[in-house]
Amino acid sequence: MLMLLALLSCAGKAGAQTVAVKSDLLTGGMLASPNLGVELKLSERFTLEAGVYYNPFPAGGDKRWKHWFVQPELRYWMCQPYGGHFFGTGLMYGVYNVAKARLPFGLFKGVRSERYEGDFTGVGISYGYHFILSPRWGLETSISVGFLHTRYERYRCAQCGEKTGSGNRNFIAPTKASISLVYMMQ
């Protein structure tokens, strides 16, 4: 029994890494996307963060704003992980089903009268700042810009299944703007 306790105490020290759990309040509110992120300290300057966003809910009326996407990101911290400035590079992949919505930057202008369904992939760079509120809590702001590629099918209306076209698009755009509440697990 004593040997087991000794092994467990060593394993805890050897494998101890700082982990943060977070929720992006800005994207959650703007896109009505429940989300959860996890960030793992890799070294004295690097962390790996991954966020999952999911909205299965109808938007009301003929509107449709269903989607899910993941956004992993490798971050370099200027001072220490989970405190101050950071730069990152990340990937993203997701699936969407959007109709009767206004999308920013002139993306899919036809989405106001037609439904678009497809997937997207992307790569981007980011900058952010983590405010330490207490030993366990933090507030993080981040903005990313990147290259996105999407393949889509276009339908005449939000509910009907009559396909009117398909295609793909490439564009450079903001890929993330976040204000996240962060909880540190140690």
Residue ranges and their predicted role:
Residues 134-186:
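Predominantly the C-terminal beta-signal and adjacent terminal strand-loop region
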Residues 40-141, 178-183:
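Gram-negative (and chloroplast) outer-membrane scaffold detector with strong preference
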Residues 10-16:
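Sec/Tat signal peptide C-region and signal peptidase I cleavage site
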Residues 16-25, 89, 175:
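Transmembrane beta-strand segments of Gram-negative outer membrane beta-barrel proteins
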Residues 18-21, 56, 106-113, 160-166:
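Extracytoplasmic loops and strand-loop junctions of Gram-negative outer membrane beta-barrel proteins
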Residues 30, 51, 57-65, 158-169:
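Surface-exposed strand-loop-strand hairpins of Gram-negative outer-membrane beta-barrel proteins
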Residues 27-47:
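N-terminal targeting signals for Sec/Tat export/insertion, comprising classic cleavable signal peptides
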Residues 1-9:
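Bacterial N-terminal signal peptides
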